[in-house]
């Protein structure tokens, strides 16, 4: 990154994220106690749901609340939490030191499960992971909510995304040649035909910019909501009774 790139560029929007008692209470709970990997497997299940937590270790809400709201308590599922807050580029304890090691672990878990349907699901940073691993493994479909689609310094600067600066800066300080920092490029190279859903709220223009990066992929459907609660879209979908419908797709 050049010296000029370190100077934050004014954001191309004036949207504000408004916290409320309803959509922000869960943030006060300590999700740091959640393990990096939590499994709840059902023998003989045909569908395996792979969940990837965001920066605060959630899926737009606490994992169990998401499962309950989405009516998937009886499904086989594995939840992953990136304790390094590095968009899953630095691996997971006991698994390996990069995203590719996580990919190998996921492949083994999918094979062992015997599942015929696999879904990669995530919110925000977790949505980035869901798209990344779905393309990496060439299996299943991704269902994502307000995902980032790039974390490379050049594109963040050009498009005016200065969110999560401390976490992104720490990652940029140790980038390697094998890191996956631009999903448009990654999907184009690995699996341009992959199937995915991207759900995004028009109340957060930066999230919209990220979603728009994936325009042009024939099997990636971008669902834009005029309202949707901004970056808290998952909770808005839950309250609207839509979350369970989406997870059944």
Please place each PLM-identified region on the residue numbering.
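Short, surface-exposed "cap/lid" segments of acyl-processing enzymes
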Residues: 11-75, 79-86
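Cap/lid segment of the alpha/beta-hydrolase catalytic domain
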Residues: 81-100
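Catalytic histidine-centered segment of alpha/beta-hydrolase-like enzymes
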Residues: 88-89, 229-239
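Conserved acidic catalytic loop of the alpha/beta-hydrolase fold
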Residues: 101-116
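Alpha/beta-hydrolase fold nucleophile elbow
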Residues: 114-124
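Glycine-rich nucleophile elbow surrounding the catalytic serine of serine-hydrolase chemistry
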Residues: 122-134
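Active-site nucleophile loop of the alpha/beta-hydrolase fold
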Residues: 144-155
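The feature captures the conserved acid-bearing segment of alpha/beta-hydrolase catalytic domains
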Residues: 161-224, 230-232, 241-248
């Amino acid at each position: 990154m050049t010296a000029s790139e370190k100077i934050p560029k004014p954001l191309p929007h004036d949207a504000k994220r408004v916290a409320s008692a309803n959509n922000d209470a869960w943030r006060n709970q300590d999700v740091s106690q959640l393990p990096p990997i939590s499994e709840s497997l059902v023998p003989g299940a045909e569908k395996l749901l792979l969940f990837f937590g965001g920066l605060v270790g959630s899926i737009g809400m606490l994992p169990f609340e998401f499962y309950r709201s989405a009516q998937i308590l009886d499904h086989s599922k594995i939840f992953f939490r990136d304790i390094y807050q590095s968009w899953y580029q630095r691996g997971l304890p006991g698994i390996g030191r990069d995203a590719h090691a996580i990919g190998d672990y996921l492949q083994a878990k999918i094979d062992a499960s015997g599942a015929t349907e696999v879904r990669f699901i995530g919110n925000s940073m977790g949505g980035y992971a869901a798209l990344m691993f779905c393309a990496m493994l060439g299996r299943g479909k991704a269902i994502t909510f307000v995902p980032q689609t790039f974390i490379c310094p050049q594109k963040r600067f050009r498009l005016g995304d200065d969110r999560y600066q401390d976490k992104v800066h720490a990652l940029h300080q140790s980038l390697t040649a094998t890191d996956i920092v631009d999903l448009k490029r990654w999907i184009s190279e690995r699996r341009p035909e992959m199937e995915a859903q991207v759900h995004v709220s028009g109340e957060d223009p930066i999230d919209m910019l990220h979603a728009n990066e994936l325009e042009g992929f024939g099997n990636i459907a971008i669902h834009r909501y005029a309202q949707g609660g901004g970056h808290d879209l998952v909770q808005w979908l839950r309250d609207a009774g839509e979350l369970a419908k989406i997870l059944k797709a």
